[in-house]
Amino acid sequence: MYQAIPYNANRAWPAASRPATAAAAPPPPPPRGEEEEVRRAVAECPVVVVGRSGCCLSHVVKRLLQGLGVNPAVHEVAGEAELAGVVAGGGGVALPAVFVGGRLLGGLDRLMAVHISGELVPILKEAGALWL
C-alpha cells in the first residue's frame, strides 16, 4: 500500500538540477532514420497521415479517411523537422500532413476543402486507396 506524504509548509522544495542555460539551447536535430522511415512510408502506402502523437487534428484526419473506407498509415513524429526533408521544398509544412499517392495533399484544412468539394474520393481512387 502506498503512503501519502503529508504536506508541510516549512519544508523547502528541492532545487532544480538543470542549469539555466540548458533552456536556451536549441533542440537536437532529428535522427536521420526517422526522416527515412517517413519517406519510405509515403512511397509504399497509398495514404499516409503524418502527425504528432495524441494530436486531435491527426485523429480528425484519420477518422475522416476511415469514414470514406480508407485505412491510412499513420506515422507519428516529434515535429515538423522530420517532415521537412520528405516534402520537396520543405517550407510551410504543418502537421498533420496527408500524403496521397506519394504526393503531399496538405493538412486538415486542405483535406476538408477537397472532401467538401467532392474531389477527395476520385483522388483516393486514383491513388489505389479505394476500390469502389
Curated annotation (Swiss-Prot):
PROSITE patterns: GLUTAREDOXIN_2. PANTHER family: GLUTAREDOXIN. Its main location: cytoplasm. Belongs to the glutaredoxin family. CC-type subfamily. GO terms for molecular function: 2 iron, 2 sulfur cluster binding; metal ion binding. Gene3D superfamilies: Glutaredoxin. [2Fe-2S] cluster binds at C55. Residues 35-131 form the Glutaredoxin domain. The keyword Nucleus applies. Residues 16-38 are annotated as: Disordered. A motif (Responsive for interaction with TGA factors) lies at residues 129-132. It comes from Oryza sativa subsp. japonica. Keywords: 2Fe-2S, Cytoplasm, Iron, Iron-sulfur, Metal-binding, Nucleus, Redox-active center. It is found in: Cytoplasm; Nucleus. GO terms for cellular component: cytoplasm; nucleus. This is Monothiol glutaredoxin-S9. May only reduce GSH-thiol disulfides, but not protein disulfides. It holds the Pfam family Glutaredoxin.
